[in-house]
């Protein structure tokens, strides 16, 4: 079946009637802010966000304990979260409330919007930099001064510097990994605070993430757009350095009235759509060297008779209704760092360093599963698709299901094979069905290293969505902000087009 939306995908994959999001799951409140503003019907058309009781948390096998971060919906002041954090550190609980107050402030939100919904050249405007300076005293007051060490730090270092409790460090670092960051990579410490503050805000789309694609399609069709799902593009038509249309693989041509926009990977854009003959050596070389072997994931869906019932629920029943729940051997973020190390080597870590997260959307939205049943999903870092052959991946997918069930059952005794109705095994190798994710199956398209983010994503020459070809623009997950299901990349491209075209 050919569906629009790319990784905004939902399928009845584990068993008939059980919906699973095969790629994007986390939706943050700001993801579609410009769309809700400009097209209020977007919500009614299906992009309706909801939250679990707890936005994030983790259960720890050795300690037989847990940590829970309540969602904004169920804990708007974050007092309940602070109470849970205080079980591990009173100091962290106090600082958590300061962070939440800072995060809710107008000054912080203005800076956030500046950095999210502006292309690279707009983000260096004096008024943008002035708003950052105005925020600085509030950061210091809350205990998050972005000094030289923080700016140079990895997520691992910054989390350990900011929080006393290893349990809270684990939650923050594990979420950074879900943001496609290798938590050992330096130069990102200024964003670790945002990772922590986002934990109560984690949302999902009722009915499945593919609802986003349907809603966007409806708006676009109403505004005169047409879609062609069986028309592979071969090349951009370039005349005198200007894009004047596209040539399809069957030889037919489609002329452009004003411009052409690509959402391909940078490699597809430069070497397939444009052609190497139109690129200078420096840009071609940089695109050739882009890194995309990290954040390749195991994404499984499980059709269940019963929702997981965690041992930690005897201490707090709300842990059963947690969105991004880490299944950890113990409360030490070092496990996440080790898992990243092994992934960089193209290897699997020892089982004690596995750091899966799991969730059960059917506990909040019954549309995900038949009455009385549930669907659960997981995410875990894996080696890139290129690390193994097809035959090896088939065996790995079987083996990983056994390993994950063994870990899960330690924390939730009812998660045995008798509780499983069906299972969908989605791996980095399976991600290759999306051409733009080849050859490694990374969910983020590009690694989020310090030299492939913000004004350097994907390269400085392409970061502002312009290409070497006039009237040919580019966007997608390989552009800022990247590695999410939101609208930042598209909206920022629109701003550049509006600036250029008038």
Give names to the regions the model predicted:
Residues 1-117:
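N-terminal glycine-rich phosphate/pyrophosphate-binding loop and immediately adjacent elements
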Residues 24, 475-499:
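A conserved FAD-binding loop/helix module that cradles the flavin
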Residues 104-223, 230, 436-452:
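Active-site/ligand-binding neighborhood in enzyme catalytic cores
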Residues 166-181, 348-359, 413-480:
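A glycine-rich dinucleotide-binding beta-alpha-beta segment and adjacent secondary-structure elements
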Residues 204-205, 234-369:
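Mid-domain catalytic core of redox enzymes
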Residues 232, 238, 499-502:
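Active-site-proximal substrate-binding core of FAD-dependent oxidoreductases
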Residues 267, 271-274, 303, 372-403:
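Conserved FAD/dinucleotide-binding core of flavoprotein oxidoreductases
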Residues 307-308, 341-351, 392-432:
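Flavin-binding catalytic cores
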């Amino acid at each position: 079946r050919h569906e629009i939306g790319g990784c905004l995908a939902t399928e009845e994959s584990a068993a008939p009637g059980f919906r699973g999001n095969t790629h994007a799951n986390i939706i943050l409140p700001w993801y579609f802010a410009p769309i809700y503003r400009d097209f209020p019907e977007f919500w009614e058309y299906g992009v309706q966000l909801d939250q679990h009781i707890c936005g994030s948390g983790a259960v720890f096998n050795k300690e037989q304990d847990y940590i829970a971060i309540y969602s904004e919906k169920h804990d708007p002041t974050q007092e309940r979260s602070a109470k849970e954090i205080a079980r591990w550190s009173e100091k962290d609980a106090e600082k958590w409330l300061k962070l939440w107050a800072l995060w809710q402030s107008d000054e912080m939100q203005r800076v956030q919007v500046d950095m999210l919904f502006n292309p690279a050249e707009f983000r260096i405007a004096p008024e943008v930099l002035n708003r950052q300076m105005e925020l600085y005293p509030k950061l210091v007051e809350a205990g998050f001064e972005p000094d030289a060490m923080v700016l140079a730090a990895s997520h691992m270092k910054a989390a350990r510097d900011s929080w006393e409790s290893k349990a809270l460090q684990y939650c923050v670092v594990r979420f950074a990994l879900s943001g496609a960051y290798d938590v050992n990579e330096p130069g990102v410490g200024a964003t670790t605070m945002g990772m922590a503050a986002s934990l109560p805000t984690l949302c999902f789309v009722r009915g499945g993430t593919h609802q986003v694609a349907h809603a966007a399609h409806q708006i676009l069709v109403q505004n005169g757009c047409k879609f062609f799902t069986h028309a592979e593009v071969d090349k951009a038509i370039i005349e005198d350095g200007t894009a004047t249309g596209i040539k399809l693989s069957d030889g037919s041509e489609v002329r452009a009235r004003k411009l052409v926009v690509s959402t391909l990977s940078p490699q597809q854009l430069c070497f397939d759509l444009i052609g190497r003959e139109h690129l200078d050596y420096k840009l071609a070389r940089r695109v050739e060297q882009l890194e995309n072997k990290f954040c390749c994931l195991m994404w499984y869906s499980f059709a269940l008779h019963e929702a997981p019932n965690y041992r930690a629920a005897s201490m707090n029943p709300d842990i059963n209704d947690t969105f991004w729940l880490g299944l950890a051997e113990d409360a030490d973020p070092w496990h996440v760092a080790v898992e990243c190390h092994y992934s960089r080597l193209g290897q699997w870590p020892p089982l004690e360093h596995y750091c899966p997260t799991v969730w059960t959307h059917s506990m909040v939205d019954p549309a995900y599963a038949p009455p009385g049943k549930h669907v659960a999903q997981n995410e875990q870092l894996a080696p890139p698709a290129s690390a193994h052959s097809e035959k090896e991946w088939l065996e790995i997918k079987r083996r990983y299901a056994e390993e994950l069930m063994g870990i899960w059952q330690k924390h939730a005794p009812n998660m045995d094979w008798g509780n499983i109705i069906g299972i969908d095994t989605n791996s980095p190798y399976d991600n290759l069905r999306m051409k733009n994710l080849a050859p490694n199956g990374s969910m983020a398209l590009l690694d989020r290293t310090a030299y492939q983010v913000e004004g350097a994503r994907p390269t400085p020459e392409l970061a502002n969505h312009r290409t070497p070809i006039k009237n040919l623009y580019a966007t997608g997950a390989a552009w800022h902000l990247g590695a999410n299901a939101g609208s930042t990349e598209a909206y920022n491209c629109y701003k550049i087009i509006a600036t250029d075209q008038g």
